[in-house]
Amino acid sequence: MRAVCQRAQSASVTVDGKVVGSFEGEGLVILLGVSVTDTEAEAVQVARKVAGLRMLDGERSLTDAGAPALVVSQFTLYGDVRKGRRPSWTRAAKGDQAEPLYERFTAELEAAGVRVERGVFGAMMDVSLTNSGPFTLIVDSDELAGPRRG
């Protein structure tokens, strides 16, 4: 599972011209990709890590600050561009596998006290945000389990 976390001062997601999720004030926009090997354990692990990351002003986390998160599903985070010019999506989980894990991730954030705004799973979405910093981190469940690099 991959979560691209961007600190933002405001954000919104629109589907078919209607705003379906938004926040004003400091929070995180989280683009979430689910791989074919992910399980509920990865969803819980990544959500807990994201909830506690000190990415907000004053070295605070989402839970410390009571700040919101806008979570948007994004299968393209698992695009493989090693061969040719067209990305391969074979590592990205299909919707029937990915959606329950997306829901588990958001539920775990909520259990940590985070106000979660959502996109619409699988929909074509327009995401707007005002980056703060910019400050962006990528949390990858494969890297959380392995030895520290560098």
Curated annotation (Swiss-Prot):
Pfam families according to UniProt: Tyr_Deacylase
InterPro entries the record matches: Daa-tRNA_deacyls_DTD, DTD-like_sf
Documented EC number(s): 3.1.1.96
Record SUPFAM superfamilies: DTD-like (SSF69500)
UniProt domain comment: A Gly-cisPro motif from one monomer fits into the active site of the other monomer to allow specific chiral rejection of L-amino acids.
PANTHER family from the UniProt entry: D-AMINOACYL-TRNA DEACYLASE 1 (PTHR10472:SF5), D-TYROSYL-TRNA TYR DEACYLASE (PTHR10472)
NCBIfam families associated with the record: D-aminoacyl-tRNA deacylase
This protein's name: D-aminoacyl-tRNA deacylase
